Amino acid sequence: MIARILDGRTCAEKVKARVKENIRLLQEKGLPSPGLAVILVGNDPASATYVAHKERACQAVGIRSTVYRMPNTITESELASKIDECNRDSNTHGILLQLPLPAHIDSANLLERIRPDKDVDGFHPYNLGRLVQRRPALRPCTPYGVMTLLTETHENLEGKHAVIVGASNIVGRPMALELLLAKCTVTVCHRFTRDLAEHVKSAELLIVAIGKPGIIQSEWIKPGAIVIDVGFSRLSPNKIAGDIDFETAKERASWITPVPGGVGPMTVATLLENTLQAAQTFL
């Protein structure tokens, strides 16, 4: 068995085309284009690269993006003031606080300070609570991007045993909520999980989001499983790896995402979707 490839780039282009068309329709009605404020703290090269990629994606679909670059020495109260300013700005429909933040800043406090209806990352407790209640509003970008990508398989997810490896607030936990919403039976594995291999072997849908290359051995993968690799590690300037060895895993899976080119493009595409949704709430 050789797995079919879940191409995140192709799927993301479909999402972006829909967003672009909806923005064109807004403009035809004389309504403003969606506006996104991105707050970038410090000089982390990876964060700067991600923000530049998001800027280009916004420009391609017609979203106005403004990047506020803050020094690494900024205080939490100063950063809170910038968020408050964006909250008040009627031309800003979405706010993205680029993570990670410097160690002296409590990111949870600041994420909660963003207005829920401008929280295009979907991290505010209000938006997570809506997801818990099965009444989603703005949804966390990576998990929802994965769900959109899964529609490309045309597989019925109801009743499938989904195993998530990783329990972060950004991916693992909201991913579990999305899969419950899709009527999967969900197991979440984390650092204290015993017999990780046995859990993975039972997965009909496997989602791995740890950031440790090779943490999942290919022989653990159930033949015919759908495999989603959210991991992203830069091993060298020209080499990127996921959490699973793609070449060996694709011989067991029915569908598999590559790294790069799998989940990453879907995260950005979902951010654009969320920004449009936030703008439509205002307009």
UniProtKB/Swiss-Prot annotation:
One of its GO terms (cellular component) is cytosol. Pathway: One-carbon metabolism; tetrahydrofolate interconversion. InterPro entries: Aminoacid_DH-like_N_sf (IPR046346), NAD(P)-bd_dom_sf (IPR036291), THF_DH/CycHdrlase (IPR000672), THF_DH/CycHdrlase_cat_dom (IPR020630), THF_DH/CycHdrlase_CS (IPR020867), THF_DH/CycHdrlase_NAD-bd_dom (IPR020631). GO terms for biological process: L-histidine biosynthetic process; methionine biosynthetic process; purine nucleotide biosynthetic process; tetrahydrofolate interconversion. GO terms for molecular function: methenyltetrahydrofolate cyclohydrolase activity; methylenetetrahydrofolate dehydrogenase (NADP+) activity. The keyword Amino-acid biosynthesis applies. Pfam families: THF_DHG_CYH, THF_DHG_CYH_C. Its EC number is 1.5.1.5, 3.5.4.9. It catalyses: (6R)-5,10-methylene-5,6,7,8-tetrahydrofolate + NADP(+) = (6R)-5,10-methenyltetrahydrofolate + NADPH; (6R)-5,10-methenyltetrahydrofolate + H2O = (6R)-10-formyltetrahydrofolate + H(+). PROSITE patterns: THF_DHG_CYH_2 (PS00767). NADP(+) binds at G166, A167, S168. Keywords: Amino-acid biosynthesis, Histidine biosynthesis, Hydrolase, Methionine biosynthesis, Multifunctional enzyme, NADP, One-carbon metabolism, Oxidoreductase, Purine biosynthesis. Belongs to the tetrahydrofolate dehydrogenase/cyclohydrolase family. Catalyzes the oxidation of 5,10-methylenetetrahydrofolate to 5,10-methenyltetrahydrofolate and then the hydrolysis of 5,10-methenyltetrahydrofolate to 10-formyltetrahydrofolate. Homodimer. This is Bifunctional protein FolD. The gene is folD.
